[in-house]
């Protein structure tokens, strides 16, 4: 099967699963089952991780189980809570994928739309022997783009580079070493470009679109790219010298989301 067609089928299956799982009837479950499993394995997971702290949310049918371990910051002796703020990093990509599914369902975009359709005026999107980068390539790590944009200062804070303008400027000078859809290679850059494209297609800034389509309907009040002073005070810090509590609008699609265990439980 051609790589692009295979990618489309895989992505379509993922989309279908994500849309139908929430619609399925809630299964009958043992009321103690989820809690028993969590209590059996959670300590092992935490102590084997080497993490400063861990918040664990498990949803099984209509059960919701929350457990926390360790500290929210080195030496503060405070366990993570449901409202502890966490950088969810690459789980942000699942929310970007959800946005793609929603806009597909609304007829705003198509999987095979070329990225160039949503490029800023004057920007160039590279092709490989005429084969374009499509939205499904970006979403399935088959875009032939690198994992990260080359350059950037060493030891910089996380999720603040490259900005939208910087990545599109770089893309205009980039070349592809393989045809999009021909091979899989993980790319954070691709997911930020995907979010840019979806924002353009919807005609709204990504934070507004993100709030309207994902966080507001579910009451996810602590899920954001621009944390407030109160949210920054609740941010879990893994080590001294960790990245400051900045806005992370540069990494809208790949990893910039701040959230809480409580919000992730709603999602």
Region spans (language model):
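Boundary at the C-terminal end of the N-terminal hydrophobic targeting segment
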Residues: 22-27
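Residue-level preference for non-acidic, small/hydrophobic
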Residues: 42, 56, 62, 93-96, ...
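Bacterial N-terminal signal peptides that target proteins for export
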Residues: 1-9
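Short, surface-exposed loop or secondary-structure junction motifs
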Residues: 73-74, 126-267
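Hydrophobic (often cysteine-bearing) scaffold residues that line and stabilize catalytic clefts
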Residues: 30, 34, 38, 88-92, ...
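Short active-site loop at a secondary-structure junction
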Residues: 48-55, 75-137, 176-189, 252-255
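Bacterial N-terminal signal peptides
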Residues: 9-18
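Short, conserved catalytic-motif segment at the N-terminal edge
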Residues: 29-86, 108-110, 169-174
